[in-house]
């Protein structure tokens, strides 16, 4: 067997050098890929965390809209010149008013005529401090009936036929807090609730408390 010639040794050195360069290039490529993979991985984790937080927040928001009773967030404070009674606020809007005038007076205050239960409770509260003479015009016109009104007496309120003109007492729900108003507006916007739901619900609660 022939021994390698000097030319063969030179060729071997060249080949080894090329192989070493190829190994260095491959290692450099691996390092470069590892360096570029970290930013992508961190970005993906950040996006995943943000999406998870968004889903959780959306779920909590929808749950509050469907299940939360915003009635517990009412401010409990009636506006100036209004009297609080149960879940309602009431105000004497005028005297000697016809039925149409009474409806218009309450509409101007974004309210409606007082209902029978609230009128009865209000009369029982004010009779000891005021006149019980019907000539003073303190016959209340009611929302529930166009022909029956309430007359305060010492023995308590009684139902009477409505004269042409009566006193006007308006009522509306107690105002909600800012948070409760936002929840209510969102429910109405999403058509999860009718606009008059709070008024009807507060009236039912007031009647239940006063019975």
UniProtKB/Swiss-Prot annotation:
Parts of the chain on the Virion surface side: 68-211
Annotated glycan sites: 96, 133
The keyword Membrane is assigned to this record: yes
InterPro entries: CTDL_fold
Entry keywords, A to Z: Glycoprotein, Membrane, Signal-anchor, Transmembrane, Transmembrane helix, Viral envelope protein, Virion
Keyword Glycoprotein: yes
Transmembrane segments: 47-67
Topology, Intravirion side: 1-46
Protein localization: Virion membrane
Pfam families: UL45
Family: Belongs to the herpesviridae HHV-1 UL45 family.
Name of protein: Envelope protein UL45 homolog
Native species: Gallid herpesvirus 2 (strain bc-1) (GaHV-2)
Gene assigned in the entry: UL45H
